[in-house]
Structures are given as C-alpha cells and as structure tokens.
C-alpha cells in the first residue's frame, strides 16, 4: 500500500487528527499512477538530489525517496512534520525542513546534501496560491537547478509555456523562458486530490538553459519592459509603454527613436513580440535613455 492510496491517506489524516488549512492551499494527491508518471517525467535516479516543496503527508516524497539519491522537503505547516516522520520512517534519505521555502537560505541548505555535487532537480506539487513567487524565487536563485517538474494550476502552466501570438503568452512566459525551456508534460484532473481543488492541474517540465535565451544589456530593465508591454493586453505597445514611461514629448520622442531602431511597429501588441524582439526593444529603450 502506498501513502497516496485513498484509504491510506484517509487513515493517516484521521490518525493524526489533521484538518486542512485553506491558507496553505493544501490538496493531497491520491493517484499512484500520476505520482509514478511525475517521477518518470523528472527522470529521477540515484545520481540526482531532489528538492520538494510542500510534501504534505509524503505521497510524492515516498516515490522520490525510492528513486533519488536524497530528498530535501520543505514544509511550511509544522503540523505535517510529525506526520511526515511517521509516513516516511522507512526512508533514511529524506530530510524534512519545517520552513517557508521563500525565506529559506537555499545556498546553505543545498550544501547539506551528503553529495552536494550531484545535479539538483525540483519536483513538487506547488500550492496554487503562491506558485509564481516560488518558481521565480528558485529560478532566479544562484543555485544551478538542472530541472523543475512541478504540478500547478493548468492555466498557469499554459501561461508559462505559451508562445507569442497566443492568449496565454505574457510577461510570465518571458520571465521563465528566458532562463528555461518549458513544456506541459501532462494534465491532472481535479478529481485525484483530497480535497478536490476548484481547478484542473498540469505537470510542467522546465529545463535550465546553459545560457539565457537572449543576450540583454540590463536584465532587470528587460523584465520591466516586458511587464510594461502587457500592462493592458488589448492596448498597443505604444500605449502600454507611454503608460509606463510617461507621456511627455521628450519621452515620446525617445520611444519613437527606440522603436524605430529596434524595427518594431508602435501599433503592435505585446503578445505579438518574441523574446528576441523584447531583448532588442529593451536594449533600444535603454540606449534612448528611458
């Protein structure tokens, strides 16, 4: 019997008198086939260390521990720590850390792996309410995670992996794809969770690029420009950029010059620009003194 078997999950929760907290976005997966598929998608083996976020009662952790060298699981809810100690007692390669991963000193934590030189993958069923902050925190950290295989709301997975000229494409697509390739591996129905969430989920597989997708002179400015370009999706690039940088004649002249230098039409919408276009645009805007 597996932790994820519905009867086992139910028994564990009853034995420990556990009640779900909405504020932590807790939804426990009760489908062993999907858990195996996650591990297979992540290609976990004994030459890989894994960081898991939000292990819950250990359903995914159990599968990870059987396949990985070590698993470091960050759990914010202290009530789940004794439950995890119970459910994972047969696995000595799991370290449960009762800490908010957004506040954790990850640089120090990853040195606590017995073999810290092994590749590190992030495999997790992320809380929906905080998926994007956690992802960006991990991606932008100086830790060279080789891969992320994470469960999230399907809508967010679609946005992250979206291509230009689609409804889902936006600043989040650019922020992630700048650093990583992103592909939806498979969908997960809401019916396989306890309690069932109000949305469907998907597994997103992201692999770190050896170098960022494009070269830019100022990364922070590049992300600022891409965000500003999607301020109002139905507005033109020109309207969004003047809303962000200002509407004085001086600013408009600089914008005109930058768009001309970048060979981008002011009447276009942000969703029509590729990440390479945004790189060219942000460098031209920076050059123009904006």
Curated annotation (Swiss-Prot):
Keyword Transcription regulation: no
GO CC terms: cytosol
Catalytic activity reported: adenosine(1518)/adenosine(1519) in 16S rRNA + 4 S-adenosyl-L-methionine = N(6)-dimethyladenosine(1518)/N(6)-dimethyladenosine(1519) in 16S rRNA + 4 S-adenosyl-L-homocysteine + 4 H(+)
Chief place of localization: cytoplasm
Residues bound to S-adenosyl-L-methionine: 27, 29, 54, 75, 100, 125
Subcellular locations according to the entry: Cytoplasm
E.C. designation(s): 2.1.1.182
Superkingdom as given in the UniProt entry: Bacteria
Record keywords: Cytoplasm, Methyltransferase, RNA-binding, rRNA processing, S-adenosyl-L-methionine, Transferase
InterPro entries: KsgA/Erm, rRNA_Ade_diMease-like_C, rRNA_Ade_Mease_Trfase_CS, rRNA_Ade_methylase_Trfase_N, rRNA_adenine_dimethylase, SAM-dependent_MTases_sf
A Pfam family reported for this protein in Swiss-Prot or TrEMBL: RrnaAD
Protein family membership: Belongs to the class I-like SAM-binding methyltransferase superfamily. rRNA adenine N(6)-methyltransferase family. RsmA subfamily.
Function summary: Specifically dimethylates two adjacent adenosines (A1518 and A1519) in the loop of a conserved hairpin near the 3'-end of 16S rRNA in the 30S particle. May play a critical role in biogenesis of 30S subunits.
The protein's name: Ribosomal RNA small subunit methyltransferase A
């Amino acid at each position: 019997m597996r932790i994820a078997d519905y009867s086992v999950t139910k028994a564990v929760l009853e034995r420990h008198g556990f009640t779900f907290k909405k504020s932590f976005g807790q939804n426990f997966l009760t489908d062993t086939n999907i858990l195996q598929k996650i591990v297979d998608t992540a290609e976990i083996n004994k030459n890989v260390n894994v960081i898991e976020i939000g292990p819950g009662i250990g359903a995914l952790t159990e599968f990870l521990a059987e396949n990985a060298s070590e698993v470091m699981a960050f759990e914010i809810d202290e009530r789940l720590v004794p439950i995890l100690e119970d459910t994972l007692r047969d696995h000595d390669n799991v370290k449960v850390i009762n800490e908010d991963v957004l506040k954790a000193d990850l640089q120090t934590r990853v040195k606590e792996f017995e073999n810290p030189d092994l590749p590190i993958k992030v495999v997790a069923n992320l809380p929906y309410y905080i998926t994007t902050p956690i992802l960006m925190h991990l991606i932008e950290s100086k830790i060279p995670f080789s891969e992320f295989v994470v469960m999230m709301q399907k809508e967010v997975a679609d946005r992250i992996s979206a291509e230009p000229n689609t409804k889902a494409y936006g600043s989040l697509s650019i922020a992630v794809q700048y650093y990583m390739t992103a592909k939806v591996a498979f969908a997960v129905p809401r019916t396989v969770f306890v309690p069932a969430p109000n949305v469907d989920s998907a597994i997103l597989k992201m692999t770190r690029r050896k170098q960022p997708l494009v070269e830019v002179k100022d990364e922070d400015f590049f992300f600022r420009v891409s965000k500003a370009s999607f301020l109002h999706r139905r507005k033109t690039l020109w309207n969004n950029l003047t809303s962000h940088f200002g509407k004085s004649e001086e600013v408009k002249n600089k914008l005109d010059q930058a768009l001309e230098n970048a060979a981008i039409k002011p009447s276009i919408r942000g969703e029509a620009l590729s990440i390479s276009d945004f790189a060219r645009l942000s460098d031209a805007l920076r050059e123009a003194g904006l």
